[in-house]
């Protein structure tokens, strides 16, 4: 599910082929007399997401900022006037052990332009490849996750995909 900044509701994007996340870290090293004595690694609150999926046309036009008031209805454009908006992304996935996991990325922005492959005579519609930068929210976090089996709150399970917010997942 995706919600573009300034909108009230998440839109369904339930046709995801693959999702690959990489969260950034920073390592601080303490040296004494030229030898490493201590290392500390911390998350930076940002990262990247690579998605391979089918995107509804309305969502595609929004996340690439392709709508122009000066163009006829049904005509879209991409170029120097396209400013990628920030958006939130939520997912319900299976982990490597077949456990249901909820994922949320509260502050995202596309870091790549439109990229599509069209093949005449293809048996299947090609998925879009999108590179997404993850940014920290007001809590300094760029990703939230929860195993369904560990969630005690039915409200969180029901609201995660369509109404994710920091308020929803805060401890009571």
What is each model feature region?
Residues 108-172:
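Mixed-charge, glycine-accented linear interaction segment located at domain edges/termini
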Residues 41-105:
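Structured, beta-strand-rich domain cores
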Residues 11-16, 101-107, 144-148:
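Short amphipathic beta-strand/extended segments with alternating polar/hydrophobic composition
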Residues 6-8, 98, 140:
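Intrinsic-disorder/low-complexity loop/linker signature
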Residues 1-63, 109-124:
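Solvent-exposed edge beta-strands and adjacent loop segments
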Residues 4, 95, 137:
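Acidic surface patches and DE-rich sequence motifs
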């Amino acid at each position: 599910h995706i919600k573009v900044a300034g909108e009230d509701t998440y839109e369904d994007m339930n046709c995801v082929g693959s999702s690959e996340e990489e969260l950034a870290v920073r390592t601080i090293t303490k040296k004494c007399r030229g030898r490493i004595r201590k290392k500390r690694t911390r998350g930076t609150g940002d990262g990247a997401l690579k998605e391979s999926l089918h995107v509804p046309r309305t969502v595609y036009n929004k996340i690439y900022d392709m709508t122009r008031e000066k163009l006829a209805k049904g005509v879209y454009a991409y170029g120097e006037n396209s400013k990628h908006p920030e958006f939130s992304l939520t997912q319900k996935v299976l982990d490597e052990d077949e456990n249901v996991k909820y994922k949320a990325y509260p502050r995202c922005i596309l870091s790549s332009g439109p990229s599509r492959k069209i093949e005449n005579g293809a048996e299947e519609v090609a998925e879009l490849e999108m590179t997404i930068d993850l940014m920290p929210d007001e809590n300094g976090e760029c990703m939230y996750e929860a195993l369904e089996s560990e969630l005690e709150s039915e409200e969180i399970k029901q609201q995660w995909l369509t109404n994710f917010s920091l308020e929803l997942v805060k401890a009571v």
